[in-house]
């Protein structure tokens, strides 16, 4: 970011390009995914239980072209997590179960022809692949030169709006450790997993500059908001 843009931000004329984690589900014991993720269990064994609070909401149904769903606190907070987001970053596991070099372009994600992002999505991977344009405005870009490059590209694509780190756990941990996340919204589900991918093992949020902003009790999850500063 250049000196002039920084000065304009201080004057309130340029929006701050926040990098955030939004509506990320964790268990009471701190796991963000279950163990043994595979094609049958993309969120790990029992991982779907973390997201029960979200699956029933109106915003989730709408994102997947369905009608109905519950309204209320959980729905409103989930909907807010998508506001002003103009680019996403995902790990390869979030995109799919394929390992190693891409044999072909047949795998196009877990979400069908119209993924729920509707923005550019930058997928971290060690193996190159051409961009994949989908229905509804989503284009997957496969980034092979690291998390900072992915963030730079996402910020450029977002054009001053927010970048959301979608996960999985490993990617969020990497961005946290690198000091590149500004704020987080965690949806704490009333679930004890006991095993899986732990979100904060070995990470000190206070040392990274995070403070608790607020907590909100939803119908099926407790929403915890933290940010730097």
Map each language-model feature to its residues.
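Enzymes that bind and transform nitrogen-containing heteroaromatic metabolites
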Residues: 2-229
């Amino acid at each position: 970011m250049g000196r002039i843009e920084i000065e304009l931000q201080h004057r309130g004329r340029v929006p701050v390009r926040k990098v955030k984690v939004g509506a990320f589900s964790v268990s009471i014991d701190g796991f963000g995914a279950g163990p043994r993720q595979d094609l049958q269990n993309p969120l790990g064994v029992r991982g779907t239980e973390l997201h029960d609070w979200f699956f029933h909401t109106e915003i989730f149904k709408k994102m997947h072209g369905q009608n109905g769903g519950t309204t209320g606190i959980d729905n409103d907070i989930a909907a807010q997590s998508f506001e002003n987001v103009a680019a996403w970053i995902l790990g390869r596991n979030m995109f799919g179960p394929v390992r190693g070099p891409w044999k072909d372009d047949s795998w196009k994600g877990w979400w069908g022809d119209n993924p729920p992002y509707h923005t550019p999505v930058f997928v971290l991977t060690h193996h190159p692949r051409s961009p994949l344009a989908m229905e509804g405005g989503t284009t997957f870009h496969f980034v092979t030169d690291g998390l900072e490059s992915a963030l730079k590209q996402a910020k450029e694509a977002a054009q001053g709006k927010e970048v959301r780190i979608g996960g999985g756990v490993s990617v969020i941990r990497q961005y946290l450790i690198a000091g590149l996340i500004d704020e987080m919204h965690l949806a704490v589900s009333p679930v004890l997993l006991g095993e899986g991918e732990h979100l904060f093992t070995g990470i000190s949020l206070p040392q990274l500059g995070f403070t608790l902003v607020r907590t909100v009790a939803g119908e099926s999850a407790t929403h915890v908001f933290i940010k730097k500063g």
